[in-house]
Design a protein with these regions (language model features):
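Carbohydrate-interacting/catalytic domains
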Residues: 1
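Ser/Thr/Asn(+Pro)-rich, low-complexity disordered segments
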Residues: 4, 8-9, 27
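Aromatic- and carboxylate-enriched substrate-binding clefts and catalytic-loop regions
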Residues: 12-167
């Protein structure tokens, strides 16, 4: 509807961003890297229309953590590559320093979004915001409690998390 309205009003638009909840509103389905079949029954068709009919690209937000009911969470959990400390929204963050976590992350991103026609993704919250993350002193405390990453202490390497995730 937004894109159609912009086109009807002759307002220039090259890209539209859906920030979150394309996976659903339930926190347990957070960032499953799949479209909710109820709210997005045919994402490939919608994206195709955005491209061919409206000449607009689609960007989706993708997060480094996952709700407990998602396949990616279950796969990351089985591989033991999730930090123990939950974020402000209650999901757990992947140890993206671990090659196994990188592979799982990319496979879900590729299969769940890229193959549907999504043009780009916005890697949101790549500085994992743990509980009370809005307060710097609390963020530091929780970061130190996150434990060990594949390459060492989370407290020591957390600042490079965004860089590693974008690779």
């Amino acid at each position: 509807d937004v894109v159609r309205t912009y086109r009807m009003r002759n307002i220039p638009l090259d890209n539209i961003v859906q920030d979150w909840q394309y996976w659903g509103e339930n926190l347990d389905s957070w960032n499953g890297m799949v479209f909710n079949p109820v709210t997005h029954p045919n994402p490939q068709k919608v994206i195709e229309d955005l491209h061919k009919k409206y000449h607009v690209k689609l960007t989706l937000s993708v997060w480094p953590g996952f709700g407990k009911s998602t396949k990616i969470y279950q796969e990351m959990d089985s591989a033991n590559v999730l930090y123990d400390v939950p974020t402000w929204a209650g999901y757990k963050v992947a140890d993206i320093y671990a090659p196994t976590a990188q592979k799982i992350f990319w496979n879900h991103l590729y299969q769940g979004l890229y193959t549907k026609g999504v043009d780009s993704w916005w890697l949101d919250a790549t500085e994992p915001a743990y509980k009370d993350g809005l307060y710097p002193e609390k963020q530091t405390q929780w970061s130190k409690k996150a434990g060990k990453t594949f390459i060492g202490s989370a407290a020591r390497y957390l600042n490079t998390y965004s860089y590693v995730l974008t690779k």
